[in-house]
Amino acid sequence: MSHDTIADMISLVRNANMRKAVKVRVPATGITQNIVKILLQEGFIKDYMKQEKRTRSFFILTLKYQGRVRKPHITAFKRISKPSLRIYSNYQKITRILGGMGIAIISTSSGIMTDREARQKRLGGEIICHVW
């Protein structure tokens, strides 16, 4: 039995956005840490910190909202490549998300990066998720 921590993280963030929660706790793994760093770097979240409880560790993400109505910065967060169906792309065929307004997070041979970085470095890889 395998467990998809990336899909869990995406579901937790989407649910927290719908509840307009300020903070959300996601499982800490190497891949989720890289995804969280990209979300912070691209301005989708305010901050994050690592919390350890006994044998498990988590990231506490501080989500970003706009204005008085608290519109979430993350409009959509979708898992693309799944354990049951892996999706790969070379750098020329990586699609621009909403004409460059969103990002694709890609796992390449040089690590996890955004679609823009992958195109600049001319690297293809597994398309993990889309965020806008």
Curated annotation (Swiss-Prot):
Q: What is its main location?
A: plastid
SUPFAM superfamilies assigned to the protein according to its UniProt record, in alphabetical order: Ribosomal protein S8 (SSF56047)
Quick one: a GO biological-process term for this protein? translation
Q: Where in the cell is it found?
A: Plastid, Chloroplast
Which one of the record's GO molecular function terms can you name?
structural constituent of ribosome
Which InterPro entries does the record match to this protein?
Answer: Ribosomal_uS8, Ribosomal_uS8_CS, Ribosomal_uS8_sf
Alphabetical list of Pfam families matching this protein: Ribosomal_S8
- Keyword annotations from UniProtKB, A to Z: Chloroplast, Plastid, Ribonucleoprotein, Ribosomal protein, RNA-binding, rRNA-binding
Q: Give the GO cellular component terms, alphabetically.
A: chloroplast; ribonucleoprotein complex; ribosome
* Residues making up the signal peptide according to the UniProt record: none
Family of the protein in this entry: Belongs to the universal ribosomal protein uS8 family.
Q: What does this protein do?
A: One of the primary rRNA binding proteins, it binds directly to 16S rRNA central domain where it helps coordinate assembly of the platform of the 30S subunit.
Q: What NCBIfam families does the record tag this protein with?
A: PRK00136.1
Relate the assembly described in the record.
Part of the 30S ribosomal subunit.
Specify the protein name.
Small ribosomal subunit protein uS8c
- UniProt organism field: Psilotum nudum
Q: Which gene encodes it?
A: rps8
